[in-house]
């Protein structure tokens, strides 16, 4: 049994590739059902910064190939497009990655907590789809607990720690516009709400919310005391705005080149566009329009570098906490790896003992019932004595999965024996 994770991240994969691999929330249930044809357990995490597929498989090599094939087939993207920048983790490396991720240590914005909600959402969908089993349940709930502990006991999450807050940092370079200009927020999800909070905190008062589902737009606007407009007014709302933050979950372009070209006509101040969505909401060609400044999530990276430098000391403290939590999980994991091997080892020994005793007793019909019981008891005692030391060693958390694998090879215990319900893929 192996835990395997493959993924692409903002650090080494451009948004042009990430948006082709991204899954919307609506797509996840069907995608997870497809994933279960390849693996025992699975979960998909798709955010503006990363796309990751994590699964429990029966071997590392087969798991790697299965997850690559799944991602390519589901997204209709040739493996040659994403494999060069793909990262692959196994077992303890997967656990460490997910624990660090939940603590905000692997985020574009160091310490950000939006990832916690994204992990919980992905976990809930995977549970509802029947894709989560005991291993990933333990890993992911352990990750959430470890992340919470790291944030509680360090300053990793102090200050501005979200992609939205980084966008606001960029807006501060246009201080007059931020306080006196007109802002448009496209979307009505968590990121849109976070944008509203930051804009209001910065003193921006002329804010409009627009969303494809108008009831969500009106509810969000009412909650924060700002204006809202129906989706059909998007082009007009854009033309009346100086700052636009777009963060929908749409599968394609929401703000077209034509809309922005119209909005830029006769403008005395620059039009600032922040595209925080993946796939991207705004046609990237708008950068060619005079007076238009476009920032996508990758363009905000320089600000994030400064953020990470300021939190370096707290990050080290958080890493130490994560190390301890990963060690606890690995103790459980080694034990879980050993249990089916110990069971199979006992069954193999018992089968051999039983067969040999039957043959021996068949050759000695003169033995009395009491003598037969003595022979059976002797054989059982010998088996127990012989297996005692190997079983104690297998149960030792310090032994590691290497010993489990070695015992399975020595006693010819295969996957079908240890995992009788194993899928054939």
Curated annotation (Swiss-Prot):
Taxonomically, the superkingdom here is Bacteria
Q: Give the species.
A: Roseiflexus castenholzii (strain DSM 13941 / HLO8)
Designated gene of the protein: hemA
Q: Where does substrate bind?
A: 47-50, 107, 112-114, 118
What does UniProt list as this organism's lineage? Bacteria, Bacillati, Chloroflexota, Chloroflexia, Chloroflexales
- Pathway assigned in UniProt: Porphyrin-containing compound metabolism; protoporphyrin-IX biosynthesis; 5-aminolevulinate from L-glutamyl-tRNA(Glu): step 1/2; Porphyrin-containing compound metabolism; chlorophyll biosynthesis
Any one Gene Ontology MF annotation carried by this entry is: NADP binding
What does the UniProt record say this protein does? Answer: Catalyzes the NADPH-dependent reduction of glutamyl-tRNA(Glu) to glutamate 1-semialdehyde (GSA).
Q: What is known of its domains?
A: Possesses an unusual extended V-shaped dimeric structure with each monomer consisting of three distinct domains arranged along a curved 'spinal' alpha-helix. The N-terminal catalytic domain specifically recognizes the glutamate moiety of the substrate. The second domain is the NADPH-binding domain, and the third C-terminal domain is responsible for dimerization.
Q: Any additional notes?
A: During catalysis, the active site Cys acts as a nucleophile attacking the alpha-carbonyl group of tRNA-bound glutamate with the formation of a thioester intermediate between enzyme and glutamate, and the concomitant release of tRNA(Glu). The thioester intermediate is finally reduced by direct hydride transfer from NADPH, to form the product GSA.
Q: What keywords is this UniProt entry annotated with?
A: Chlorophyll biosynthesis, NADP, Oxidoreductase, Porphyrin biosynthesis
> Does NADP count among this protein's keywords?
yes
User: Which Pfam families does the annotation name?
Assistant: GlutR_dimer, GlutR_N, Shikimate_DH
Provide the GO biological process annotations.
chlorophyll biosynthetic process; protoporphyrinogen IX biosynthetic process from glutamate
The similarity annotation says:
Belongs to the glutamyl-tRNA reductase family.
Q: Where is this site: Important for activity?
A: 97
Q: Which InterPro entries match?
A: 4pyrrol_synth_GluRdtase, 4pyrrol_synth_GluRdtase_dimer, 4pyrrol_synth_GluRdtase_N, GluRdtase_CS, GluRdtase_dimer_dom_sf, GluRdtase_N_sf, NAD(P)-bd_dom_sf, Shikm_DH/Glu-tRNA_Rdtase
Binding of NADP(+) occurs at 187-192
Enzyme Commission (EC) number: 1.2.1.70
Write down the top EC class of this protein.
oxidoreductase
Subunit comment for this entry? Homodimer.
PROSITE patterns from the UniProt entry: GLUTR
Record: active site: 48 (nucleophile)
Reactions listed under catalytic activity = (S)-4-amino-5-oxopentanoate + tRNA(Glu) + NADP(+) = L-glutamyl-tRNA(Glu) + NADPH + H(+)
Q: What is this protein called?
A: Glutamyl-tRNA reductase
